[in-house]
Regions:
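N-terminal alpha/beta PP-like core and its mobile active-site loop of ThDP/TPP-dependent enzymes
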Residues: 1-127
Length: 127
């Protein structure tokens, strides 16, 4: 339900393109995009940093925001260089990242990093 609400909010805000780096933790988001397939364009990438810069490039070519969806942990961290560029170029880049439960942080569990403030300096809003 949360995933569908997030995706619907993006569509309502004008996102028409989603760049996806599929992973196990963001699979519900990727699956949720199927409900919007007639409204949006999807691009699939294997590597997050390249995907983020592709999404940034799409914001330069389109008059609307572009969203990128990744799994958790270092996959989300790979977006940071493009997020910084988007910030300084004032481009509407939307990052949607999966996350592990809070109890896994600091436990040594894979892909369990502190994501809550990862983009905060360079993002207009962050929740």
């Amino acid at each position: 339900m949360i995933a569908q609400s997030v995706l619907q909010a993006c569509v309502n805000l004008g996102v028409r393109e989603f760049v996806v780096c599929a992973g196990s933790r963001n699979s519900v988001l990727v699956h949720g995009l199927l409900h919007h397939r007639d409204q949006v364009e999807l691009y699939s990438f294997f590597e997050e940093r390249s995907a983020a810069f592709f999404a940034l490039g799409r914001t330069l070519a389109q008059p609307y925001p572009v969203a990128i969806i990744t799994t958790s942990g270092t996959a989300a961290a790979e977006l940071l260089p493009a997020v910084i560029e988007a910030h300084y170029q004032e481009r509407p880049l939307v990052m949607i990242t999966a996350d592990r439960p809070i109890r896994y942080r600091g436990s040594g569990a894979p892909q369990a990093i502190e994501q809550s403030e990862l983009f905060s300096v360079y993002a207009e809003t962050y929740d």
